[in-house]
Regions:
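Structural recognition of the beta-strand scaffold that forms the well-ordered cores
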Residues: 170-171, 177-180, 238, 265-269, ...
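Aromatic-lined carbohydrate-recognition surfaces of secreted/lumenal glycan-active proteins
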Residues: 237-243, 268-270, 310-323, 387-388, ...
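Generic recognition of stable, solvent-exposed alpha-helical segments in well-folded globular domains
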Residues: 164, 213-217, 221, 245-252, ...
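Catalytic core of carbohydrate-active enzymes
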Residues: 424-428, 433-434, 440-454, 477-487, ...
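Alpha-amylase-like alpha-glycosidases and glucanotransferases acting on alpha-linked glucans and related
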Residues: 338-383, 418-458, 520-541
Length: 664
């Protein structure tokens, strides 16, 4: 502690400097000003007070801070050691204080990454990132007409920072990381060079600090902290999962796709529960059990597919349609979250229909959902996997059984939802055989969710909501401990004339083949959009790349084993293995494990693209041509996206076999 202040040092480098005449910590009070429309939020804050803490004392290693005009408002600060690193604990007992602001220091050339699953920017410098789980929006670029239209239609345009999975954790190029252990709304502000601004809507905050000799070891430390995922099942990585939602015609179409020679290990029918038609498109009937009218023979179809090595996957989310039977069951058992102004169940508007919220703070309700719905209606029925959708919509004016503040429960909800799903699988002893995938997340979801998907991209090449965002999402989420990531092949959102093109389908097929899981989706408006079976060319291309994906399975299995041991993600930024500032901004290509670089075409109209190769000798997967370090212009025809493998890889035999089977 210095006279009139204190410094927080990391390896003799100052991270936080607080002085009476230049306070780095402020406290205050505020009232949230929020509006939610179907998971899209307008977030404002009415700040009623903001006080710099200009008085300092220390008693028994506890620093006390206050403002000279309000000495009764005291903030205590303690530095403790944890198994993972150091923890800076800030507390203010004043009941009216609910805001904290801190300004930490950094070097002017320090780079930052993380923030959960970020769609627009891998490197966070120069921008402000609120952490609040929500719909990411459609368009996500305030300069575009689509975003402006969606904003006008229900706050649904989004922005560069909106994401299903925020996490207040960031990594530094100086090989340290910071995590805010809070579920409250918080903000990372990197708009001012040399400063790291933190805002937290709570008077209680733990700032966890991590250090490591390398960036890879830092990622391992974060994975140790937040939890590891189990290995993906063999069937999930050994072929494509075909998504169809065409009711009685699904199996006919599936057999056509299967007869193309595609390597298929899964059939995913999210409409297994039935359909509800809305102006947005085909929606599902949210009563989570087999709909015999939609799929009359599904109970016989599932074992028949299994005999061919094809698993069946479905869909579930944490809400119950008010006109469904399971809603009535939950209501009868008092398992639903309530309104604040009455004991009536809270009804959430999901766009032309309402649904109830199962209260996962009620342990009996959480167990009921795990056992009664996922266990009995899904796993026992024969499902091997599912999309565990949503988790971002918890209203902030809801009443929960545990009495928790919904402003904080909101961010915790995806984690509770993930645990409900994981518990169901564990209860059947199928943790290594069944799987589910989620788009929503927050700190701690890593311990429960085995597989992320990138959410609802637009079916286009746009900068902030198109195919390219899938790569950024995989890389950013991987840095904070999520080893497995994939996307909806073809994209999802088709609105206001935005529809899939043949070029987009071909490029997404190429991209999906080089992810741990290759899964297609028909999108929100299947009839308006190209599908896998819409043309012989698309189907043949899908069949080819599904076989490439299947042939890569031994390599993916090795990466999965590495992920279990170290927490390293399968898709990695180049800088994770080659710590060079020249690579800190790269977000349109990635290392697939240490031995492969994948550079998909994610811009419209390209027939080639620039690929940055780090040091070493790199073999072009399709031709065998050897390239060295540097930037190379590489041809990128459909079916041969720019992919390179390390010449000295222990997997060279496998890579050579792929070239012999699919190369030119």
């Amino acid at each position: 502690m210095q006279t009139g202040g204190f410094d927080l040092l990391r390896d003799d480098v100052c991270m936080l400097s607080h002085r009476s005449d230049k306070p780095a910590i402020e406290v205050g009070s505020g009232t949230p000003d929020l509006e939610m429309v179907r998971g899209n939020f307008r977030i404002g804050d009415v700040v009623e007070s903001r006080l710099p803490l200009d008085c300092i004392s220390e008693i028994n290693d506890v620093i006390r801070l206050w403002n000279k005009a309000q000495p009764e408002l005291v903030v205590t600060l303690e530095l403790e050691q944890s198994v993972h690193g150091s923890v800076l604990k800030l507390r203010c007992a004043n009941p009216t204080t609910n805001r904290l602001w801190l300004t930490m220091q950094c070097s002017t050339n320090e780079a930052f990454w993380g923030g959960g699953e970020q769609m627009s920017y891998l490197k966070l410098n120069g921008r402000r990132f609120p952490f609040w789980t929500s719909e990411p929006g459609v368009g996500r670029d305030k300069t575009t007409r689509l975003t402006q239209t969606m904003d006008a239609e229900g706050l649904a345009g989004g922005d560069y920072w909106t994401t299903n999975y925020p996490q207040p954790t960031w990594l530094s190029s100086e090989r340290h990381a910071v995590h805010l252990e809070t579920a409250a709304y918080s903000v990372l502000d990197l708009t001012e060079q040399g400063k790291v601004g933190i805002e937290c809507w709570s008077a209680k905050l733990d700032i966890e600090l991590f250090d490591a000799p390398s960036l890879r070891e830092l990622v391992t430390n974060l994975s140790d902290r937040f939890g590891r995922q189990p290995p993906l099942p063999d069937w999930a990585i050994s072929g494509a999962i075909v998504g169809l939602k065409d009711g009685a015609d699904t199996l006919t179409r599936f057999e056509k796709i299967a007869s193309s020679g595609a390597a298929i290990t899964g059939l995913w029918c999210e409409d297994w529960v039935g359909i509800r038609q809305t102006s947005f498109g085909k929606r599902l009937f949210w009563d989570w059990k087999w709909n015999a009218a939609r799929y009359p023979d599904l109970h016989a179809t599932i074992p028949s597919l299994a005999a061919r090595g094809i698993r069946f996957l479905g869909y579930v989310n944490p809400y119950l349609a008010v006109d469904g039977a399971l809603y009535q069951e939950a209501l009868a058992n008092s398992y639903l979250a309530l309104r604040q102004d009455s004991d009536a169940p809270y009804a959430v508007d999901f766009g032309e229909f309402d649904a109830g919220v199962v209260d996962f703070t009620n342990l009996d309700a959480a167990h009921w959902f795990s056992e009664r719905i996922i266990g009995r209606e899904m796993l026992d029925f024969g499902l091997s996997g599912w999309m565990a959708d949503f988790g971002e919509y918890l209203p902030t004016d809801i009443r929960l059984l545990d009495g928790s503040d919904p402003m904080e429960a909101h961010n915790r909800w995806p984690v509770l939802w993930a645990k409900v799903n994981a518990d169901a699988i564990a209860s059947r002893g199928k943790t290594h055989d069944a799987t589910f995938f989620m788009r929503a997340g927050f700190s701690g979801v890593q311990a429960h969710c085995p597989l992320l998907w990138a959410g609802d991209q637009c079916v286009d090449f746009t900068r902030h909501d198109g195919i390219n965002t899938v790569i950024t999402a995989a890389l950013s989420s991987g840095l904070v401990g999520n080893a497995y990531h994939h996307s909806d092949l073809g994209g999802y959102t088709s609105l206001h004339g935005v529809v899939r093109t043949s070029e987009l389908m071909h490029r997404w097929i190429d991209l999906a083949a080089f992810a741990p899981v290759m899964r297609s989706h028909e999108g929100n408006r299947p009839a308006d959009n190209l599908q896998l079976d819409s043309s012989p060319e698309i189907l043949a291309h899908f069949a080819r790349m599904s076989r490439v994906h299947a042939q890569l399975a031994p390599y993916v299995r090795a990466l999965s084993e590495e992920a279990v041991a170290t927490g390293l993600p399968l898709q990695r930024p180049v800088f994770l293995h080659y710590d060079d500032p020249a690579y800190y901004d790269i977000q349109d290509q990635y290392l697939y494990g240490a031995d492969m670089i994948v550079a998909p075409v994610v811009e419209q109209g390209q027939t080639s693209r620039l690929v940055i190769l780090p040091e070493g000798e790199w073999v072009h997967l399709w031709t065998g041509t050897v390239h060295g370090k540097g930037t190379h212009n590489v041809a990128a025809p459909h079916g041969q996206p720019p992919v390179f493998t390390r010449k000295d890889s222990t997997h060279t035999y496998l890579f050579t076999s792929i070239r012999q089977a699919f190369g030119s």
